[in-house]
Swiss-Prot record:
Belongs to the bacterial ribosomal protein bL21 family. Transmembrane segments: none annotated. This protein binds to 23S rRNA in the presence of protein L20. Keywords: Ribonucleoprotein, Ribosomal protein, RNA-binding, rRNA-binding. The keyword ATP-binding does not apply. This is Large ribosomal subunit protein bL21. Disulfide bonds: none annotated. One of its GO terms (cellular component) is ribosome. It comes from the Bacteria. One of its GO terms (biological process) is translation. The gene is rplU.
Amino acid sequence: MFAVIRTGGKQYRVTPNAVLKVEKLEAEPGSTITFTDVLAVGGEGNLTIGAPVVAGASVTATVIAQDRLDKIVVFKKRRRQNSRRKNGHRQHVTVLRVGDIVAA
């Protein structure tokens, strides 16, 4: 069974026991999060697509850790003008383990 959920402005295809890195969510490690923005649920040859969400469907996940991704370097240079700028940042993410997928 699989589901497509929406969180942080992105869509993720999840299966039970999958480990997933999503945009930072305000939750402590060990806590449980329920996603109700389920866009599609499928498995065993059937697929339910929501318009825009599947009514009554939900996905639960457990927070494993709050982490940061590798550094992204942003470098801008203007040729022949001795002008350059270097910035960087590390994106905050929440690491989740998907639990149950409940279809309507």
